[in-house]
C-alpha cells in the first residue's frame, strides 16, 4: 500500500513531504497541537503532489487536455511564436486543489522548448499569459504535421515550473512532461482548421479530456491506455 502511495506522488514532492513529516515529528515532541498542524500540512502536500493514473484515449488525431482545471477562455489570437499566424488558444486554470502534473496533448515530436522569465500575477487573469514566467514546448503532430504549442504559466503562488520535455523527443499523448506548483495556468495553442470539442467553463482532466480533433473523427472507434 505504501509503495502504491509513493508511486502516485510526483517526485517533485518527495523532499517537501519528507521535510513536512520531519517537522511534524519535531512538532509532536514540542506539543501535540504543533505536531497536528505540521501533520495536516504534510497530508496537504501529499494531496497536492498526487499523480494519479489516467485513462488516456488513444489516437494520433486527438488533442488531449494537458492539465486538470477549468477552461477560462477559447479565443483566436496571434501565435506566440509567429505574430503573422492566427491560432486558437485554450486557457486552462488550475487551482491549488487540482492535480498539477502536466501531460503531452498530442503525439508527435518536440521541435523546441523555451523558458520565458516574467512576473507572478494571478494565473486567473488573462494578462498572465503574456506577463508571467512560463515554460513553452512546441510539438509537431504526427498527423498532418500541425504545430501545437503548450505554455506552462506560473501564478501568484506557483513559482516553480518543471518541464522534462526536450527538443527532438518523440512523445505520445497523455505522457507526463512536467508539473507546476501551487496554482497556475496552462495555455494550449492550436491551428484554426481543426474540430474543437471543448467549451468555455468546461472542467477538464489532464490526459483524459479530448479538447479537439486534428482530422474528421466521428466514426472512428476510440481505444484507451492507462498512464
From Swiss-Prot:
UniProt cofactor(s): pyruvate
Entry protein name: Phosphatidylserine decarboxylase proenzyme
PTM text: Is synthesized initially as an inactive proenzyme. Formation of the active enzyme involves a self-maturation process in which the active site pyruvoyl group is generated from an internal serine residue via an autocatalytic post-translational modification. Two non-identical subunits are generated from the proenzyme in this reaction, and the pyruvate is formed at the N-terminus of the alpha chain, which is derived from the carboxyl end of the proenzyme.
Annotated localization: Cell membrane
The entry's keywords: Cell membrane, Decarboxylase, Lipid biosynthesis, Lipid metabolism, Lyase, Membrane, Phospholipid biosynthesis, Phospholipid metabolism, Pyruvate, Zymogen
EC assignment: 4.1.1.65
Enzyme class of the recorded protein, top EC level: lyase
Catalytic activity: a 1,2-diacyl-sn-glycero-3-phospho-L-serine + H(+) = a 1,2-diacyl-sn-glycero-3-phosphoethanolamine + CO2
Record bears the keyword Lipid metabolism: yes
UniProt-annotated catalytic positions: 184
Lineage: Bacteria, Pseudomonadati, Pseudomonadota, Alphaproteobacteria, Rickettsiales
Site, Cleavage (non-hydrolytic): residue positions: 183-184
Source organism, top-level taxon: Bacteria
A molecular function (GO) term: phosphatidylserine decarboxylase activity
Cofactor remark from the record: Binds 1 pyruvoyl group covalently per subunit.
Family in the record: Belongs to the phosphatidylserine decarboxylase family. PSD-A subfamily.
Membrane-topology annotation of the record: Peripheral membrane protein
Gene: psd
Pfam families: PS_Dcarbxylase (PF02666)
Pathway(s) of this molecule: Phospholipid metabolism; phosphatidylethanolamine biosynthesis; phosphatidylethanolamine from CDP-diacylglycerol: step 2/2
Amino acid at each position: 500500500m505504501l509503495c502504491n502511495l509513493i508511486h502516485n506522488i510526483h517526485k517533485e514532492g518527495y523532499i517537501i513531504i519528507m521535510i513536512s513529516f520531519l517537522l511534524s515529528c519535531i512538532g509532536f515532541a514540542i506539543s501535540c497541537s504543533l505536531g497536528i498542524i505540521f501533520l495536516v500540512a504534510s497530508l496537504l502536500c501529499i494531496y497536492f503532489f498526487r499523480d494519479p493514473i489516467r485513462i488516456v484515449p488513444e489516437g494520433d488525431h486527438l488533442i488531449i487536455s494537458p492539465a486538470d482545471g477549468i477552461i477560462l477562455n477559447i479565443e483566436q489570437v496571434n501565435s506566440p511564436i509567429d505574430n503573422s499566424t492566427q491560432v486558437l488558444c485554450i486557457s486552462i486554470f488550475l487551482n491549488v486543489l487540482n492535480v498539477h502534473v502536466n501531460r503531452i496533448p498530442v503525439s508527435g515530436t518536440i521541435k523546441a522548448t523555451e523558458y520565458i522569465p516574467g512576473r507572478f500575477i494571478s494565473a486567473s487573469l488573462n494578462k498572465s499569459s503574456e506577463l508571467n514566467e512560463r515554460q513553452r514546448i512546441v510539438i509537431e503532430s504526427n498527423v498532418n504535421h500541425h504545430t501545437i504549442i503548450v505554455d506552462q504559466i506560473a501564478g501568484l503562488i506557483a513559482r516553480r515550473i518543471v518541464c522534462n520535455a526536450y527538443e527532438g523527443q518523440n512523445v505520445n499523448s497523455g505522457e507526463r512532461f512536467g508539473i507546476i506548483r501551487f496554482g497556475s495556468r496552462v495555455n494550449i495553442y492550436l491551428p484554426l482548421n481543426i474540430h474543437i470539442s471543448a467549451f468555455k467553463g468546461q472542467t477538464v482532466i489532464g490526459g483524459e479530456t479530448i479538447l479537439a480533433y486534428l482530422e474528421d473523427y466521428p466514426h472512428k472507434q476510440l481505444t484507451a491506455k492507462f498512464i
